[in-house]
Amino acid sequence: MTSKKERLDVLLVERGLAETREKAKRAIMAGIVYSNENRLDKPGEKIDRDLPLTVKGNPLRYVSRGGLKLEKALKEFPVSVKDKIMIDIGSSTGGFTDCALQNGAKQSYAVDVGYNQLAWKLRQDERVVVMERTNFRYATPADFTKGMPEFATIDVSFISLRLILPVLRTLLVPGSDCMALVKPQFEAGRESVGKKGIVRDPKVHADVLKRMISFSAAEGYICKGLSFSPITGGDGNIEFLLHLHWPGEGQEGQELPEEEIMRVVEEAHKTLKEKKADVPE
């Protein structure tokens, strides 16, 4: 049996402990990467995929930075994952799943169109149902053999939430909550996306959010809250956290006040700009 090993610098990026391979190498060479009490100083060293890793001065509680996004949502919004079956759409390394399990979730369906991305820690967790190579757009209730989801998280790229939310409503138990990550770069028109795929204009952010909230309400979701991700995406884009509630078929959806959307956009730009200024490259 072949041992499941990967380069140290690659693992740091996979787990969200470094944004790029180059930054991972710099951290390793600087002597701030540890596994338990052992310092690791060779970027190309092959190590077990499930080895615990920490970057000194940057302790991450989850298998990837994605966990920080859900952590903020659980703190800001009146919602709990305790004892719930969740579905993690676009699970990738599993940051959302890890955060949910640490907050008492009973089970997680980790759904991703990709393969071999989920952290080994989660692969080996009996509470996690790994659904790799799965295009959520074609998911049906029959795919969920261990109970229907009562809580959902969505963190997808290169696809609009408009293709995800209509499918999700056919799977959720009435009374479920959803934390959807709104990524303006995948929702705005091409003319609104700048160089390197980054959306910087607050007006575009507000417009994307207004349209997404209207769409969600038209699909029957109640929009209960809006915030912004505490970290930017890997490409530097500001992302937003949308709290949706699914009341069940035949119920009316509900939007958020426009002034609330504008307030969150303004706060996101101010906070993340200050945070960026405080962090040396």
Curated annotation (Swiss-Prot):
Record has Ubl conjugation as a keyword: no
Annotated S4 RNA-binding domain residues: 6-67
BP GO annotations: methylation; rRNA processing
Ordered alphabetically, the record's keywords are:
Methyltransferase, RNA-binding, rRNA processing, S-adenosyl-L-methionine, Transferase
MF annotations from Gene Ontology: methyltransferase activity; RNA binding
Task: Tell me which EC number(s) this protein carries.
Answer: 2.1.1.-
- Which CDD domains does UniProt cross-reference here? S4
Q: Which SMART domains match?
A: S4
The record's listing under Pfam families reads: FtsJ, S4
**Class of this enzyme:** transferase
The UniProt entry, under PANTHER family, shows:
BACTERIAL HEMOLYSIN-LIKE PROTEIN (PTHR32319:SF0)
Record-stated family = Belongs to the TlyA family.
The name of this protein is Putative rRNA methyltransferase YqxC
